[in-house]
């Protein structure tokens, strides 16, 4: 019998991150010592009080059977308290919270709940490639909103084609931004919410890096007037609490969006292990100093790395205003970021993420993650220094 995958599977975009790290695995098989600054995988451990909460909860027999389909009230109440404490936003834990098994799962579910075949989704370019996966599975169409450095990597809503707006039903925003490290303020969110309301577009704000803005406290989209009228915010435990492997996230916002998400997930999942929910609750209610300390560590790494690159390589980089990524231009001797990243892997055994993974506007950039200790960052620079690449000419011709 011939097994024939569905048309949806056949039309899925390439999983670019998987392809990049497949190359890394192949190189590691040769015995090479790889310095991986490509993946946004936090290198520091989950705080002990969170791990201990999971350990204790795992011994609780009440969590060993099926739990509530839509999550335990104690976690939703902790989420509401967290949003009130951090952003001054009031969340109804019963009607305005949905739980996910990770941010990627959340993006997928939200697209399935908000898009019909033929609808248009507005996404940033460059932007997180997983937005495209859910849009494709919903059989919707993609419209790219270009992000440019001169505009602070914020989309210009006024330049979106009116014909596109007639069919647009969903817009993704993401600040602090992956991959550029740009941030948005309350005024921008107010403008975005008003625009979405005017054109009847659902707005999903991906707040995965919400803990990491360096000059001031990040604003939540939900602080904006009309935010709950038009959309929801997706928050991940992965970066804020060093819990990437735990696969936990949540959405908060418009109760009709949350209701649709919960109804969808009722047919796909049977809740989340109660021990994980207990640990997540401990994370949200714990001492905020953990996150502040983590932010200081990333800022120190960014300052150290960018200064070292300029001093030793002549490679000038704009420091990110948020996240833990450096968005760096590539030398003009390379045509694409894929070509540059492949060259670094082959000749220096270091990994960066090609900017093209995030869209065509990333062709001349790579994303470098500050998820390694300073000794590794120094070794990364030392290895590239031996290649004698013309970073100086990059500055002269591109600025």
UniProtKB/Swiss-Prot annotation:
PROSITE patterns in UniProt: AA_TRANSFER_CLASS_1
Function in brief: Part of the bacABCDEF operon responsible for the biosynthesis of the nonribosomally synthesized dipeptide antibiotic bacilysin, composed of L-alanine and L-anticapsin. Bacilysin is an irreversible inactivator of the glutaminase domain of glucosamine synthetase. Catalyzes the reductive amination of the C2 ketone of tetrahydro-hydroxyphenylpyruvate (H4HPP), with L-Phe as an amino donor, to yield tetrahydrotyrosine (H4Tyr) diastereomer. D-Phe is not an effective amino donor. BacF associated to BacG converts 3E,7R- and 3Z,7R-ex-H2HPP to 2S,4R,7R- and 2S,4S,7R-H4Tyr, respectively.
Disulfide-bonded cysteines: none
Major localization class: cytoplasm
Cofactor dependency: pyridoxal 5'-phosphate
SUPFAM superfamilies: PLP-dependent transferases
GO biological process, one term: antibiotic biosynthetic process
GO CC aspect terms: cytoplasm
This protein's UniProt keywords: Aminotransferase, Antibiotic biosynthesis, Cytoplasm, Pyridoxal phosphate, Transferase
Name this polypeptide is given: Transaminase BacF
Family: Belongs to the class-I pyridoxal-phosphate-dependent aminotransferase family.
UniProt keyword Glycosyltransferase, yes or no: no
Superkingdom, natural source: Bacteria
């Amino acid at each position: 019998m011939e097994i024939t995958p569905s048309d949806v599977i056949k039309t899925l975009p390439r999983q670019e991150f998987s392809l990049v790290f497949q190359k890394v695995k192949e190189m590691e098989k040769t015995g090479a010592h790889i310095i991986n600054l490509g993946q946004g995988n936090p290198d520091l451990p989950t705080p002990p009080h969170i791990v201990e909460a999971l350990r204790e909860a795992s011994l609780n027999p009440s969590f060993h059977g099926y739990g509530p389909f839509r999550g335990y009230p104690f976690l939703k109440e902790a989420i509401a308290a967290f949003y009130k404490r951090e952003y001054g936003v009031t969340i109804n834990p019963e009607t305005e919270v949905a739980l996910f098994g990770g941010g990627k799962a959340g993006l997928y579910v939200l697209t399935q709940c908000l898009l019909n075949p033929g609808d248009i989704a507005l996404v940033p370019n460059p932007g997180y490639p997983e937005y495209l996966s859910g849009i494709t599975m919903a059989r919707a169409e993609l419209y790219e909103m270009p992000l440019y450095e001169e505009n602070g990597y914020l989309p210009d809503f006024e330049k979106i084609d009116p014909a596109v707006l007639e069919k647009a039903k969903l817009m993704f925003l993401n600040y602090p931004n992956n991959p550029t490290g740009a941030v948005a303020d309350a005024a921008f969110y107010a403008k975005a919410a008003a625009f979405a309301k005017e054109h009847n577009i659902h707005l999903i704000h991906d707040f995965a890096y919400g803990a990491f803005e360096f000059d001031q406290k990040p604003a939540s989209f939900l602080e904006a007037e009309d935010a709950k009228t038009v959309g929801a915010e997706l928050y991940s435990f992965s970066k804020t609490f060093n819990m990437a492997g735990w696969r936990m996230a949540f959405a908060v916002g418009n109760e009709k969006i949350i209701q649709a998400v919960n109804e969808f997930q009722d047919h796909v999942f049977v809740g989340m292990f109660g021990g994980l929910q207990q640990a997540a609750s401990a994370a949200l209610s714990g001492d905020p100093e953990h996150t502040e300390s983590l932010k200081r560590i990333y800022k120190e790494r960014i300052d150290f790395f960018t200064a070292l690159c300029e001093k030793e390589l002549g490679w000038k980089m704009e420091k990110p205003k948020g996240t833990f990524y450096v968005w760096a231009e590539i030398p003009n001797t390379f045509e694409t970021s894929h070509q540059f990243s492949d060259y670094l892997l082959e000749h220096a055994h270091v990994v960066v993420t090609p900017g093209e993974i995030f869209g065509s506007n990333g062709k001349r950039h790579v994303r470098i993650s500050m998820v390694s200790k300073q000794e590794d960052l120094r070794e990364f620079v030392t290895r590239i220094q031996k290649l004698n690449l013309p970073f100086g000419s990059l500055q002269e011709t591109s600025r």
